[in-house]
From Swiss-Prot:
Residues 59-472 are mitochondrial intermembrane. It comes from Eremothecium gossypii (strain ATCC 10895 / CBS 109.51 / FGSC 9923 / NRRL Y-1056). It is found in: Mitochondrion inner membrane. This is Mitochondrial import inner membrane translocase subunit TIM54. Keywords: Membrane, Mitochondrion, Mitochondrion inner membrane, Protein transport, Translocation, Transmembrane, Transmembrane helix, Transport. Component of the TIM22 complex, whose core is composed of TIM22 and TIM54, associated with the 70 kDa heterohexamer composed of TIM9 and TIM10 (or TIM8 and TIM13).
């Protein structure tokens, strides 16, 4: 056909191989800005994956902040309520234990990020007890109960002694047998009385030169409640802390006040069982013979006459630096049924001086700490990392339930509180714990007489409480 121009095959191939020019504004081209082109498929896929990952993290973090703010707003009215100067706020006791094979900081993050914020907004006071070694929380709880028993017994003995002194015959005897004290003894008694009665309110603050306000006694809010269940509270962060708390309550209420005598073989077994299993296994240390061979040339150069002094001092330094194992339990779980409940702990038990209800009367809250370990658990770790908001809501809701006191009696099934955490425990750690008779891997046992005094905080009752608040 006339007028039709056909390109040679070589020129067609060159035109097809050249890339199409992107969009370019004439003004941009005049300024030297290159043409805008869309990235290739590979770059699009890369930025899509990176953007989705970052967006998932940002969304999850934002939801966590929203959840914490929501549950903090539910208890904010209690923190803004009026409180007298002579009244101390409600006080909680928090026991924190690390997950197996990890550090204590893992559990402390749960406390700081989710639980502490809600308690702070509610205006509650708290005491945090942390420990990495197994058995220390159990001993601490048992010792608090035993000390309460000692104080109650001492108060009863002092009351009986005061009643005996009021009798006229005893007063005549004391007057007849009394001895005249020297001036030094009287001065010592006056000094001790001054130290016992001295407070900084006599010198500082608004109490200075204000006798009525200074003499006013300060009371704990927990001591003024009629029902001991509504006083204070106990929070166990971690399944291990909960197991030790239950064991410590049984040991303190059923066991003796003084430690039992142990056989010579028992301390070795108990120290091995109480060894810290929460940390990763340490590297094997070189033997004493290898250390002696390694230090032999240096000792020959510096002090050839005393080659054994350094070798004998090294074990002593190591033994002094090593922490002592926690004391062994006074009673074993198999002995619960054969032991009698202490007479001091019958009925409404309160401290003689502070009038605060006993620890086992206060409501209990358990917060599990899920923690996966191992390379094969990577997919589950990634899923939990992007869905942390669900765990945050569980923790914040439980903390709000503790503040609002949604309490119910303790049931035998409540021994399984936080048992889902044990599914994440490393198998190797569990096997080693069974060989060493660890407290955490043993079945949790309880006595009906002890758990009858316990109460738990149930976050599931929050819905009923919210409905009641809406109706009112």
């Amino acid at each position: 056909m006339m007028g039709e121009f056909k390109h040679p095959p070589q020129e067609k191939q060159k035109m097809s191989s050249t890339k199409k020019a992107g969009y370019s504004n004439p003004a941009f081209a005049a300024m030297g800005i290159p043409a805008l082109r869309l990235p290739g498929p590979k770059w699009c896929a890369f930025w899509l994956v990176v953007g989705a990952g970052i967006a998932g993290v940002v969304y999850d973090k934002r939801e966590q902040r929203r959840i914490c703010k929501h549950y903090s707003s539910l208890v904010k009215d209690q923190g803004a309520a009026h409180m007298d100067t002579w009244l101390k706020p409600r006080r909680l006791t928090v026991f924190v234990a690390p997950p197996p094979g990890d550090y204590l900081e893992t559990s402390m993050k749960v406390w700081r990020r989710y639980v502490k914020q809600v308690l702070f907004e509610a205006g509650l006071d708290y005491e945090v007890f942390t420990e990495e070694r197994q058995g220390v929380i159990r001993h601490e709880v048992a010792e608090r109960v035993r000390q309460l028993r000692r104080d109650i017994a001492a108060a009863e003995a002092a009351e009986q002694r005061a009643l005996d002194e009021k009798r006229w015959l005893n007063r005549m005897r004391s007057w007849w047998r009394r001895e005249k004290l020297s001036e030094e003894e009287l001065e010592r008694i006056r000094a001790q009385k001054f130290r016992d009665e001295f407070t900084y309110k006599q010198l500082l603050g608004v109490f200075y030169k204000n006798a009525p306000l200074r003499e006013q006694k300060v009371w704990d809010a927990d001591a003024l409640v009629e029902d001991p269940v509504l006083a204070g509270g106990v929070i166990c962060i971690g399944r291990g802390a909960y197991k030790e708390y239950i064991a410590g309550i049984h040991e303190g209420t059923l066991g003796p006040l003084d430690p039992p005598t142990l056989t010579p073989e028992a301390p070795t077994e108990l120290s091995a069982a109480a060894e810290d299993l929460t940390q990763a296994p340490e590297q094997p240390e070189p033997s004493a013979a290898a250390e002696a061979l390694k230090q032999a040339p240096e000792q020959a150069e510096h002090s050839p006459a005393e080659p054994d002094s350094a070798a004998t001092d090294a074990p002593d330094e190591k033994s002094n630096n090593a922490p002592a194992p926690p004391p062994a339990p006074y009673v074993s779980p198999d002995e619960y049924s054969s032991l009698s409940l202490s007479q001091e702990l019958v009925g409404d038990v309160r401290h003689p001086s502070s009038h605060i209800p006993a620890l086992f009367h206060q409501p209990l809250l358990v917060i599990p700490v899920p923690n996966l370990s191992g390379f094969l658990q990577t997919p589950r770790k990634i899923y939990r990392f992007y869905t942390r908001r669900y765990y945050a809501e569980e923790c914040c809701k439980a903390a709000a339930a503790m503040v609002l006191q949604t309490i119910r009696p303790f049931q035998p099934d409540d021994l399984n509180l936080g048992i889902s955490e044990e599914e994440d425990w490393p198998r190797r750690w569990v096997e080693q714990g069974r060989e060493r008779k660890s407290e955490w891997v043993q079945d949790l046992k309880a006595d009906p007489r002890v758990i009858a005094e316990l109460h738990v905080v149930d976050p599931a009752l929050m819905a009923d409480l919210a409905a009641t608040m809406n109706l009112n």
